[in-house]
Design a protein with these regions (language model features):
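A generic secondary-structure signal for well-formed alpha-helical elements
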Residues: 44, 48-52, 135, 139, ...
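Bergerat-fold ATP-binding/catalytic subdomain of histidine kinases
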Residues: 130-145
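Conserved catalytic core of two-component histidine kinases
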Residues: 102-104
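Bergerat-fold GHKL ATPase/HATPase_c domain
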Residues: 1-99, 125-132
Length: 228
């Protein structure tokens, strides 16, 4: 068995702790499946809008301050615009769709699978740490997005599934991970048997190595979860 990448423990962003639990109590736990599909589709739309803004700024048609304000503090630092996160060569300038698919008998134990696929900015190394961190958000310093609460794909766990899967491409790197209640397992293996060599990796702030597969595909993200 080929060993995969290392895992990452679940966290709660301290700056947004109260807000997160208020939202979970009032909406997510009461209507988990409709809320999950709505949240994931909204995330996809937000990723597309972020891409459009990044293209405008990178191509000189707009300035960051046209769309973003700069604020600091634990709740806002991750939402400040960072031009180094984006690369025009990897952003899909043609496809702006958010695809929602439902496939029968394709999940673990032959359950059905819902997938939401966007062609936005992708999830790069610096955002991977926020994948399972409740309250983590990159949207609090702009009025151009729907979301800012820091729930994201994590809402899929409220439907009763054991995990959800994220496959994402960011600037030539394809990552894949299974996200559980208390951890995220990065599942691109350390060694690529087809290429006969190790897969490259990035290192997170806590030293976790996350392997990826190099790709020519444009930035995109697919979030999938089982439906019982």
């Amino acid at each position: 068995q080929i060993k995969g990448s290392e895992g990452l423990a679940k966290k709660i962003n301290k700056g947004a702790e109260k807000m997160v639990f208020d939202i979970l109590q009032s909406t997510q736990y009461s209507t988990p499946i409709p809320s999950t599909v709505r949240e994931l589709a909204t995330n996809g739309a937000d990723a597309q809008r972020e891409k459009e803004i990044a293209i405008e700024i990178l191509s000189g048609k707009a300035k960051a301050e046209d769309y973003y304000i700069e604020r600091h503090g634990e709740q806002y630092d991750d939402s400040n615009f960072d031009i180094s996160y984006y690369d025009l060569d990897h952003l899909d300038t043609e496809n702006n769709d958010v695809l929602i698919t439902y496939k029968e008998n394709e999940g673990t134990g032959y359950c059905d699978v819902v997938s939401i696929h966007d062609y936005g900015v992708g999830i790069g190394a610096r955002r991977l740490e926020g994948v399972l961190e409740l309250g983590y958000s990159t949207k609090r310093n702009t009025a151009e997005n729907f979301g800012a609460f820091g729930l994201g794909a994590k809402v899929a766990l409220s439907t009763g599934v054991d995990f959800y899967t994220i496959e994402t491409v960011h600037n030539g790197k394809r990552f894949k991970m299974n996200c559980y209640n208390y951890k995220t397992d990065f599942i691109v293996p350390a060694f690529n048997p087809q290429a006969g060599k190790p897969n490259p990796h990035v290192v997170l702030s806590d030293g976790t190595k996350v392997h990826y597969v190099p790709t020519d595909a444009k930035n995109q993200t697919i979030v999938s979860f089982g439906v019982k």
